Amino acid sequence: MQLFHLCLIISCTCPTFQASKLCLGWLWGMDIDPYKEFGATVELLSFLPSDFFPSVRDLXDTASALYREALESPEHCSPHHTALRQAILCWGKLMTLATWVGNNLEDPASRDLVVNYVNTNMGLKIRQLLWFHISCLTFGRETVLEYLVSFGVWIRTPPAYRPPNAPILSTLPETTVVRRRDRGRSPRRRTPSPRRRRSQSPRRRRSQSRESQC
């Protein structure tokens, strides 16, 4: 909490620091869950190890390459686009704060404490947030939630009773589609519909009657 109060004092004296209170409160460990409205939780994201998430720069470049037009548009495209835009903006403001702290704090220990905290703890939260919304836009929210649950079950299962490799997000849509197709087609192949039987019998009778007339 001393670090939190220190950064609040610094942010009040820094004219360029405009990050939202919601983003700041969540990043500093307050009781705010940014995933709740999207059907996920912070705990669900925490099952993924820290080295699973790419760097903030790589995630920001991916978001810009895939969704630049929607992110730069003043219109509201979707909740995921808006959350992604705010996360990128928040990280930029935090980098401005870290730079300002590094240039203005006289105490080297306090300066290093703030800068390291921003780059490690807060950086991980931003990486998780960016990955979640980019994945939801790319693969669909239901697929991402299914992946998080599958990975959570896999990581909590003892190694002797689980597959050697963790689930892969990009393979979940194919598996889901195959399951739906198999379930939908199998009853049709086994038994024909009764309506077809009834519709075929009058046609056969008519054809037989025509042959007898000829």
UniProtKB/Swiss-Prot annotation:
The keyword Amino-acid biosynthesis does not apply. Residues 1-19 form the signal peptide. Residues 186-214 form a propeptide. Residues 165-214 are annotated as: Disordered. Phosphorylated. GO terms for cellular component: extracellular region; host cell; host cell cytoplasm; host cell nucleus; T=4 icosahedral viral capsid. The record marks R185, S186 as: Cleavage. Residues 186-208 are annotated as: 3 X 8 AA repeats of S-P-R-R-R-R-S-Q. Sequence repeats lie at residues 186-192, 193-200, 201-208. It is found in: Secreted; Host nucleus. Residues 178-207 have a biased composition (Basic residues). Residues 25-27 are annotated as: HBEAG. Keywords: Disulfide bond, Host nucleus, Host-virus interaction, Repeat, Secreted, Signal, Viral immunoevasion. InterPro entries: Hepatitis_B_virus_capsid_N (IPR013195), Hepatitis_core (IPR002006), Viral_capsid_core_dom_sf_HBV (IPR036459). One of its GO terms (molecular function) is DNA binding. One of its GO terms (biological process) is symbiont entry into host cell. May regulate immune response to the intracellular capsid in acting as a T-cell tolerogen, by having an immunoregulatory effect which prevents destruction of infected cells by cytotoxic T-cells. This immune regulation may predispose to chronicity during perinatal infections and prevent severe liver injury during adult infections. Belongs to the orthohepadnavirus precore antigen family. Homodimerizes. This is External core antigen. It comes from Hepatitis B virus genotype A1 subtype adw (isolate Philippines/pFDW294/1988) (HBV-A).
